[in-house]
């Protein structure tokens, strides 16, 4: 299993719109997301992702077998999703 560590760029962290964009992109990938030493959760579950309480500037770890999905999701989190049209 591979991992990617990402600093959250969205001003509101992974709440509301950024969480929806992220979890939609993560659907079907099998990727998990964790904040700090917390237990990883399914990255496609908006409720579980929002429950992590990830804020702007926090570091999260993505894990999974699909390298391409990990890269895409890491790039997504590294952008300010609040600023996306």
Where are these regions (language model features)?
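Intrinsic-disorder/low-complexity, polar/charged segments enriched in Ser/Thr/Lys/Arg/Asp/Glu/Gln
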Residues: 1-5, 59
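C-terminal structural segments of small proteins and small subunits
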Residues: 51-85
């Amino acid at each position: 299993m591979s991992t990617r560590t990402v600093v959250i760029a969205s001003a509101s962290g992974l709440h509301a719109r950024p969480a929806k964009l992220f979890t939609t992109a993560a659907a079907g990938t099998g990727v998990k997301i964790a904040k700090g030493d917390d237990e990883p959760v399914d990255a496609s579950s908006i409720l579980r992702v929002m429950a992590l309480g990830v804020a702007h500037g926090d570091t999260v770890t993505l894990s999974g077998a699909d390298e391409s999905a990990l890269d895409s999701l890491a790039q997504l989190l590294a952008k300010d999703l609040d600023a996306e049209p």
